[in-house]
A protein has these predicted regions:
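Short beta-strand and adjacent tight-turn residues that come in two discontinuous sequence segments
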Residues: 20
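Short, Asp-centered acidic motifs that coordinate Mg2+ and/or phosphate
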Residues: 16-17, 36
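A substrate-engagement module of RecA-like helicase motors
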Residues: 1-16
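Conserved helicase motor core of SF1/SF2 NTP-dependent helicases
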Residues: 8-10, 23-178
Length: 178
């Protein structure tokens, strides 16, 4: 059932799942209405907004990766209130400590040779490649001299300088190797 106004909500109708924006959760009509509030992409939600949303529940589950997308728009809040809720909660830790939450430690996107590097550099060595990701490889054409392996991270030096927004030199190399 779609609601155009949060004031139309009747939780006596047996609603099991309710989705809404931060603004909907901050509405006084929502006070203590939810058993749990799941905040997806919590790295994009400021502490100030999370505090406002928290009036709807006693249990909050933050979901997301603080290393990915940051807040799309940032308000000016005093102290730490403007930080993303994940950054604030993690207190500069790269990954969630076991006593504070659950890290989904498997990825089905990254080939193991890429994942191993990313895991070591960004995720405290706690991320692993799973499933069919090991089969994600490049087919290298015989005349290609730039790409020397089918999977992993490879440095290809390109001679250019001062390109901050676009690089024709990089585009040319990509065209050559693709």
């Amino acid at each position: 059932k779609r609601l155009d106004n949060v004031k139309e909500i009747s939780f006596s109708e047996g609603i099991k799942v309710f989705g809404g924006t931060a603004w909907a959760m901050c509405n006084s009509v929502m006070k203590d209405k939810l058993d749990y509030l799941f905040v997806d992409e919590a790295g994009q939600v400021s502490v100030a907004n999370l505090v406002g949303m928290s009036q709807a529940t006693k249990n909050i589950v933050l979901i997301g990766d603080q290393m990915q997308l940051s807040q799309p728009a940032k308000g000016v809040h005093p102290g730490s209130a403007g930080l993303s809720s994940l950054k604030f909660f993690l207190d500069d830790a790269a990954t969630i400590p076991n006593d504070k939450g659950i890290l989904l430690s498997g990825t089905h996107r990254l080939h193991p040779e890429i994942c191993d590097f990313i895991s070591a550099e960004v995720y405290d060595g706690r991320l692993s490649s799973e499933g069919e990701a090991k089969n994600r490889t490049l087919k290298i054409s015989k005349g290609n001299k730039s790409i020397t392996k089918e999977a992993g991270i490879l440095y290809v030096p390109i001679n250019h300088y001062g390109n901050s927004q676009a690089s024709l030199e990089e585009a040319d190399i990509i065209s050559e190797i693709s």
